[in-house]
């Protein structure tokens, strides 16, 4: 395919409409592209060629007959490997689920599929979503496509735990990808890979078919190259789902982004607690520059305080590990998960199956969570963490009576080198990597990461915008304005 490739979903849809390109031809090219880059970047754990070609053929027929299903008909999309996809293996990048093939699809993928989307493949992740680098996977680490080198351990991490999805979009293989976000797992890799990453309001998107990590914080996330594409995907998958009691019952009103955006009267808050230890000068400079841009455009920019931010990472860690210990208990080798050959007794079968199926990170969180949930520790750890979580949510509620949105860093720096990243423990790295992102999960509020510029090492630097619950319409509108001003140049070429 020696032509200029579409850069956005709108361009792709226009190409299909004008018949200058058809979904089947485009999907064949995408699969070749995915396979070619898979060996270098390790973004995909499996490429679903047969499924994709069948879906693309059906889409091509619909386009020829003029009976398309919407703006995503024929669009190539990747799905993180913790979302169930019918008849396509779903492993959570763990040996525990290495042979699991779901008989049903997650609601969010089901809705994309009904809209004509094409499943390119399942993407790499940290095991069960427990990580911030996409380095703890049975399939090996994912390499950031912005890396100066892909040799040895000198590559840049992709972020996590949805690193494979972020790289699939950033490298130009897919137009969009599904990630999950428990404490920043969509926004963190979006920041490091220079793409848009949205964590919607808790309850706006169905969690049915998303293999749970922390039920009270997990949300499906969206990764795209543009804010408009993000809105298109959100419109396709948001809304009530009778199979998930935590989704809101009110019908979703689609996001419509205006062509002209005026910021006069808009109130932007800069949380002082996010100017924290470890924040790089480049990120700090970028943060200040975008705040100035917003002010110059007519917005009011003021400092605000979120007093419980410093406690948030500790509370998040406690609650995360408590829920992990509960959720992982289902994998016993009998009902779910890997079954060990050593079955002299039920106790031995349980022990060996879990020892062989889980990696050290998962085991550590299970043990720590069980410790916090012991009768003697329950009140002083779990109960107290729940109380402080409520105070964190109240911080946001109070702030949003004074400002409309909060502007913060997404990550404290650009993507670190893999060889440096793995020197720290998973727990220590998550404490650093999730500092700016996990408070939004604690409060259940929507947040979006936007690429702003490149660092001196030519790596993406991103910022985060947070808003009140169910403010996606206005949140994405402001995000689109910022995007239009910074004009971030994406890595993926549109010419092949």
From Swiss-Prot:
Compartmental location: Mitochondrion
Gene3D superfamilies in UniProt: Amidase signature (AS) domain
GO annotation terms (biological process): glutaminyl-tRNAGln biosynthesis via transamidation; mitochondrial translation
Residues at the catalytic site: 80, 161, 185
EC annotation from Swiss-Prot or TrEMBL: 6.3.5.7
Reactions this protein catalyses: L-glutamyl-tRNA(Gln) + L-glutamine + ATP + H2O = L-glutaminyl-tRNA(Gln) + L-glutamate + ADP + phosphate + H(+)
HAMAP family referenced in this protein's UniProt entry, alphabetically: GatA (MF_00120)
Membership in a protein family: Belongs to the amidase family. GatA subfamily.
Record-given protein name: Glutamyl-tRNA(Gln) amidotransferase subunit A, mitochondrial
């Amino acid at each position: 395919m020696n032509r200029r490739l579409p850069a956005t979903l709108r361009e792709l849809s226009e190409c299909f409409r004008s018949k200058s390109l058809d979904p089947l031809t485009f999907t064949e090219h995408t699969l070749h592209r995915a396979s070619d880059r898979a060996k270098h970047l390790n973004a995909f754990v499996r490429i679903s060629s047969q499924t994709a070609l069948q879906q693309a053929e059906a889409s091509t027929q619909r386009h020829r007959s003029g009976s398309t299903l919407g703006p995503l008909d024929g669009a190539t999309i990747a799905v993180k490997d913790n979302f169930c996809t019918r008849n396509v293996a779903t492993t959570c990048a763990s040996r525990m689920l290495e042979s699991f093939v779901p008989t049903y699809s997650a609601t969010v993928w089901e809705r994309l599929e009904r809209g004509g989307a094409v499943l390119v493949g399942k993407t790499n992740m940290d095991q069960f979503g427990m990580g911030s680098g996409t380095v703890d996977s049975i399939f090996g680490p994912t390499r950031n496509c912005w890396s100066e080198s892909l040799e040895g351990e000198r590559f840049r991490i992709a972020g996590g735990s949805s690193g494979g999805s972020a790289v699939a979009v950033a490298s130009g293989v897919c137009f969009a990808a599904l990630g999950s976000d428990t404490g920043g797992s969509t926004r963190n890799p979006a920041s490091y890979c220079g793409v848009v990453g949205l964590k919607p309001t808790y309850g706006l998107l169905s969690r049915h078919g998303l293999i749970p990590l922390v039920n009270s914080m997990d949300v499906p996330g969206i990764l795209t190259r543009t804010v408009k594409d993000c809105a298109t995907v959100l419109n396709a998958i948001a809304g009530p789902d009778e199979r998930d009691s935590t989704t809101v019952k009110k019908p979703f009103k689609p996001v419509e982004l205006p062509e002209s955006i005026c910021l006069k009267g808009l109130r932007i808050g800069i949380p002082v607690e996010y100017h924290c230890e470890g924040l790089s000068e480049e990120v700090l400079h970028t943060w200040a520059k975008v705040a100035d841009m917003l002010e110059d455009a007519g917005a009011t920019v003021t400092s605000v305080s979120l007093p419980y931010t410093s406690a948030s990472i500790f509370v998040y860690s406690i609650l995360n590990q408590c829920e992990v210990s509960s959720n992982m208990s289902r994998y016993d080798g009998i009902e779910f998960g890997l079954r060990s050959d050593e079955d002299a007794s039920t106790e031995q079968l349980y022990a060996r199956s879990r020892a062989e199926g889980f990696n050290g990170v998962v085991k550590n969180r299970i043990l720590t969570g069980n410790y916090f949930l012991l009768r003697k520790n329950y009140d002083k750890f779990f109960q107290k963490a729940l109380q402080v979580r409520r105070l964190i949510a109240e911080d946001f509620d109070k702030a949003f009576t004074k400002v409309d949105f909060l502007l913060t860093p997404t990550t404290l720096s650009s993507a670190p080198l893999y060889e440096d990243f793995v020197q720290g423990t998973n727990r220590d790295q998550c404490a650093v990597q999730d500092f700016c992102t996990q408070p939004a999960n604690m409060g259940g509020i929507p947040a979006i990461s936007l690429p702003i510029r490149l660092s001196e090492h030519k790596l993406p630097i991103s910022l985060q915008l947070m808003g009140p619950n169910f403010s996606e319409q206005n949140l994405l509108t402001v995000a689109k304005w910022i995007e239009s001003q910074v004009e971030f140049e994406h890595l993926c070429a549109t010419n092949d």
